[in-house]
Regions:
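Ankyrin-repeat boundary/"N-cap" motif
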Residues: 5-14, 38-45, 72-80, 107-113, ...
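Ankyrin repeat A-helix N-terminal signature
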Residues: 15-20, 48-55, 83-90, 117-124, ...
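Ankyrin repeat structural motif
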Residues: 21-29, 53-64, 89-98, 123-132, ...
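Intrinsically disordered, low-complexity regulatory segments in ankyrin-centric signaling systems
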Residues: 1-31, 39-43, 47, 64, ...
Length: 170
């Protein structure tokens, strides 16, 4: 029985990344897959879906099944919103996580917020705009004292620097 659950959990972790149909995810959960299962890096289905899957419906199905929106992976202490801000090309994923109660200004182990991660790494400016629209702290600093605007300058994100300055960032 344990081997069967382990197999279901692996399928759920994979489906979180690739599924485009909610019924696929719901079927695995109905069979007994653990919504809190972790892969070898400590990532849960909600974290993987936030990072790699642009299907908001899959994300919502995981949330409805009880996924922990605030849980952070063990190495970098990044949660689902951090992971989405870092790599997702979908502002709808960001909006869905925020609507579900994700902490907009939560920090990872370096003190980076979702906005810092998006400004530094995500080429999709609509993701950054979604975080700003939601009220992300434009003057947040990581634990070394680097600000959002400094990250934007270092990443050569001229448009973002201009937008942040217009909003009063320093």
């Amino acid at each position: 029985m344990a081997k069967n659950i382990e197999s279901l959990n692996k399928k759920l972790l994979a489906a979180a990344i690739t599924a485009t149909k909610v019924k696929d995810v719901k079927a695995l959960l109905a069979e007994g897959a653990d919504i809190h299962a972790q892969n070898e890096w400590g990532l849960t289905p909600i974290m993987l879906a936030s990072q790699y899957n642009s299907s908001v419906n899959v994300l919502k199905a995981l949330l409805e099944a009880g996924a922990d929106i605030q849980e952070a992976e063990p190495k970098y202490r990044s949660n689902a919103l951090h992971l989405a801000a870092n790599t997702s090309s979908s502002p709808k994923v960001i909006a869905t996580l925020l609507e579900a109660g994700a902490d907009l200004n939560a920090r990872n182990y370096l003190g980076e917020t979702a906005l810092i991660l998006a400004v530094n790494s995500n080429e999709e400016t609509r993701v950054i705009s979604e975080l700003l629209k939601a009220g992300a702290d434009i003057n947040a600093r990581d634990y070394q004292g680097h600000s959002v605007i400094e990250y934007a300058k270092a990443a050569k994100r001229t448009y973002i620097v201009t937008q942040l300055k217009k909003m009063g960032a320093h």
